[in-house]
């Protein structure tokens, strides 16, 4: 999860988020090199007194600054497309959970179970226990098994919402009348916090998401107790 004054991205806790972090570093390095080159050329232009008033064309230079940007764009596009295909790929999910956005709470339904569903509301600040996080805690956490592929079906009952958990690299729009899907998987247990990431009204900032990833045996006990 994020912490105060954090300058970087949250720690990756899923394979997709690890790929996104690598892509971020890869792209940032390209931007840094381009910026350094541009600043160097500008500094030369400001400090040198040499001029080329007789130069009418420079075919070699034009060729270079056409081919080089094309190569740079390819170096950025290829890993980006790879990650996009990885995010869209859903192969034999072990569990499917349907989440619906409301003003201003989330509801969840475990579609593999006959009657396992609940609403998840933010806990008001005055009701928080010591150590709990303001604007991030909910009354019902989404308990999921770790090390398993989970399909999330996401939609909305009223207005546009967005179901987002940054540390897992997830952000999927919840659109009324449309069912979007995404997958999540994490290799270690823990609590993962997120929030609605689409302005949806006056209480938009009061729609937290809390995922509790646990070993499969713990998940089975929890699901049995909820039925």
UniProtKB/Swiss-Prot annotation:
CDD domains: CcO_II_C. It catalyses: 4 Fe(II)-[cytochrome c] + O2 + 8 H(+)(in) = 4 Fe(III)-[cytochrome c] + 2 H2O + 4 H(+)(out). Keywords: Copper, Electron transport, Magnesium, Membrane, Metal-binding, Mitochondrion, Mitochondrion inner membrane, Respiratory chain, Translocase, Transmembrane, Transmembrane helix, Transport. One of its GO terms (molecular function) is copper ion binding. The keyword Magnesium applies. It is a multi-pass membrane protein. GO terms for biological process: ATP synthesis coupled electron transport. Pfam families: COX2 (PF00116), COX2_TM (PF02790). Cu cation A2 binds at residues 196, 198, 200, 204. Mg(2+) binds at residue 198. Its main location: mitochondrion. Component of the cytochrome c oxidase (complex IV, CIV), a multisubunit enzyme composed of 14 subunits. The complex is composed of a catalytic core of 3 subunits MT-CO1, MT-CO2 and MT-CO3, encoded in the mitochondrial DNA, and 11 supernumerary subunits COX4I, COX5A, COX5B, COX6A, COX6B, COX6C, COX7A, COX7B, COX7C, COX8 and NDUFA4, which are encoded in the nuclear genome. This is Cytochrome c oxidase subunit 2. It comes from Phoca vitulina.
């Amino acid at each position: 999860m994020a912490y105060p004054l954090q300058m970087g991205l949250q720690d990756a806790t899923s394979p997709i988020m690890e790929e996104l972090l690598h892509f971020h570093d890869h792209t940032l390095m390209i931007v840094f090199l381009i910026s350094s080159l541009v600043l160097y050329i500008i500094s030369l232009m400001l400090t040198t007194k040499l001029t080329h008033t007789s130069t009418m064309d420079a075919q070699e230079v034009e060729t270079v600054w056409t081919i080089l940007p094309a190569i740079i764009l390819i170096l950025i596009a290829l890993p980006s497309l790879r990650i996009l295909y990885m995010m869209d790929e859903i192969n034999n999910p072990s569990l499917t959970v349907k989440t619906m956005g409301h003003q201003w709470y989330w509801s969840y339904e475990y579609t593999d179970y006959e009657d396992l569903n609940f609403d998840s509301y933010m806990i008001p600040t005055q009701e928080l226990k010591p150590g709990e996080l303001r604007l991030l805690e909910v009354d019902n956490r989404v308990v999921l098994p770790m090390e398993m592929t989970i399909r999330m079906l996401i939609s909305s009952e009223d207005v546009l919402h967005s179901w987002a958990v940054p540390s897992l690299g997830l952000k999927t729009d919840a659109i009324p009348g449309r069912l979007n899907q995404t997958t999540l998987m994490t290799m270690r247990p823990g609590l993962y916090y997120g929030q609605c990431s689409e302005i949806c009204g006056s209480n938009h900032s009061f729609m937290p998401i809390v995922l509790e990833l646990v070993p499969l045996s713990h998940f089975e006990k929890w699901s049995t107790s909820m039925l």
